[in-house]
């Protein structure tokens, strides 16, 4: 991968970069590995997906295509890579806003058996829906309104959901943590969740997207 035709890139804290496009044919549900080589200094704290349920392998020194990762340190997180954007002919996608239920809580490490994985597999097997992909934007411990882990849904919706390319629909499957964390002491949580959902729906419809809600 290159960034502006350069084989290396420097990121400031909180900064995002998009690589140059690369020609690489992918199949639906194909697993993909990305190797990140750090320069002279490894970051003290690397941004990561805490609940990836997928193993990363860490070795010292610069990796090469023949690098042996079998003796590397294992970590069940993804590091640094926020997303992969894939171009396809007549392809669309459904983005899912969710918490740990969507992120993969209870699924099997390295098996890719979250509910969104089964959903994507089912869509790909039906000729009528095989052109539709599924984008899992679930974050364990996430809330819609406030608190929880990472930015709440009302903050990250525009970036994480509407910022995706090629969308045709959105599924909103979040709110459990708001009710469980604040509902007992805050009787307004229900009404404020409804207001947040209505705002998500409005924004989605403005983009011409279908918006589906999941029961919580």
Predicted regions and their residues:
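N-terminal secretory targeting modules
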Residues: 1-97, 107-109, 128
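Mobile, glycine- and charge-enriched loop segments
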Residues: 126-144
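Alpha-helical cap/lid subdomain in secreted, periplasmic
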Residues: 110, 117, 121, 125-127, ...
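Extracytoplasmic/secreted cell-surface and envelope-processing proteins
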Residues: 43-44, 104-105, 144-146, 179-184
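Catalytic nucleophile-elbow at a beta strand-turn-alpha helix junction centered on a G-D-S/GDSL motif
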Residues: 91-117, 140-143
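Structural recognition of the beta-strand scaffold that forms the well-ordered cores
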Residues: 93-98, 102, 132-138, 168-173, ...
